[in-house]
From Swiss-Prot:
It comes from Paracoccidioides brasiliensis (strain Pb18). Component of the mitochondrial contact site and cristae organizing system (MICOS) complex. Signal peptide: none annotated. This is MICOS complex subunit MIC60. The gene is MIC60. Residues 356-379, 405-456 form a coiled coil.
Amino acid sequence: MLRTSIATSRQLLSSPVCPKASAQWLRSSNAGRANTTTRRYYAIQQEPNGALRSSLSPSAAAVSDVSQRASNSTNTKRPNTSDLNVRSPASPSTGSTLKPETVLVAPVSPLRQGQSSPGSAAPAPEPAAAPPPSPPPPPPAPKTGRLRKFLLYLFLTTGLAYAGGVWYSLRSDNFYDFFTEYAPYGENAVIYLEERDFRNRFPNATKKNNRRAVAPRDEGAQVTIPGGSGLSWKVAEEQQEGSDISKKGPHMSAVDNNKATKDTKTVEKTKGGVTSKSPAQKEEAVKTKPAPEGVKTQPAKVAETPREPAIPAITTIDHLVLNTEDEPVVQDLVKVFNDIITVISADAPSSFSGPVAKAKEELEKIGKRILALKSDAQASAQKEINDAHASFDKSAANLIRHIDEMRAEDATKFREEFEAERERIAQSYQEKINTELQRAHEVAEQRLRNELVEQAIELNRKFLSDVKNLVEHERESRLSKLAELVSSVAELERLTAGWSNVIDINLKTQQLQVAVDAVRTTLENSNVPRPFIRELAAVKELASNDEVVSAAIDSISPVAYQRGIPSSAHLVDRFRRVATEVRKASLLPENAGITSHAASFVLNKVMLKKHGSPAGNDVESTLTRAENFLEEGNLDEAAREMNSLKGWAKLLSKDWLADVRRVLEVKQALEVIETEARLRCLQVE
């Protein structure tokens, strides 16, 4: 920005406001290019020449404003080569709407006048016009942020889809299996939500599960009490054996031998860790323990009074026992209450003995009430059962009576229907018998009538034959001669009709033979292929009812009788031309290139032509044999020889083989037609 302001100030002080007219019109063409090459752009857009306007006079500012308006429609001047950073003043172009005469001339500032002496001959420099302001830089292209939007939408869509999948997994088991198997961390998310839902629905469930179970207290290590310690009524020698209290015995249990419950727990001493024995247990243990050998027990001289133990015996609360084995609900309630008693006995039995006793009484009352309710319910149920049995018995009796009545009615009805059906069947059979008898009488009468008619006819025939014999005998057999004459005339008529058919068949056969000869003559006498559609149509018309002739004509290719077939001489001449080309390509492989064609052409020049009937499957031998067959007139064998060629030789002779096939097809069809005509003549004879 500093360099631009300095260059602008220099341009204002050095260049005139209105340049010369000649320079304007001469440099107008190059002004646009110079302006585009020297124009500078900055990121921060500021008002051009703002600092300069503040320091210049108001007249200079006005001039700069006018020049700025004029520069919007004009091009800039090409910069001087001596200073590329200084912009040239604006020069009006031919298309400018502001004329140079309308530009205001800025007055000379006092500072410039003071610098020039009054007597100097040099004219004072004119104040320079304000340079054209640089056009505002184009606004920067707004950032589209497509990648940011795409990532944001993708993240939101993925999150919504994942949340929807978790939500739907809680509703559908099938989708739960799919989501937990394929979605990452899907199973953890679903399990977490299920746990949260469970905690919200059952807030007290976790508290019960988190309660620590009462674990048995650690009894510590085994403690051995010396033999001389403790109180005993026996002598000291008897304490040698069994001084270890870790062995099994009654002393291992610190509670009474109350066998009513199985869940009683021992209460241990918190600091000493050694269980104390009650006097009764000690006496019982001493009585059950056998005396060691060699030591004789002596009766105590003075009976010692039992002393109270240092630690008072622990009192326990008796368990609740109710005789309700057949009530599982009551038994479960008693079991739960006994468990509570066991826990209380282990902790502080004396504190809760009163409430427990009261609870026992209430539970006993509840048990008795339940038993009473059960007995009442059983009694009412038994009464209802008895009433139901009575009603069922009554209903069964009524039902049985009703069934018996219905059975009797059905039996009566069935008997009546049976009698009516029996009468109807007997009547129908009687009618059938009467009908059969009547028909038998009619048949017998008709048979007798027919026999009488036959006898009458036979008598009439005998009478006629007798009359005929008598007439013949009287007229000397004239009637028999007339009969013979009639039969002879009929035979002559039959023979005449048969010979007329023979004559017609012979005439058609001759006409067919003439038509076939016309076709053959047309084919043999034509030097060039000529159509023979009319001749073939005449043959088909004469043998319209003969299937063999029609099949032979249909076997001829339409191309053959529409375009004609070549003659034998034409085929021989064409064969010789084809044979020349085939010999040139006789040495070519199937996938031959230009080199192979050239080599085959050169080698063909030095090959010797075979004569006679050479043996072999090479191209030259095959061509020689085919040529011999053509000279003999055997087109069939020549075509067979040419058809045995392979590769380029067969490809080159393909057209010649097609012509030969058409010729052979036509000749074969004509031979079949001639044979059929001869066969007709033989059949007539």
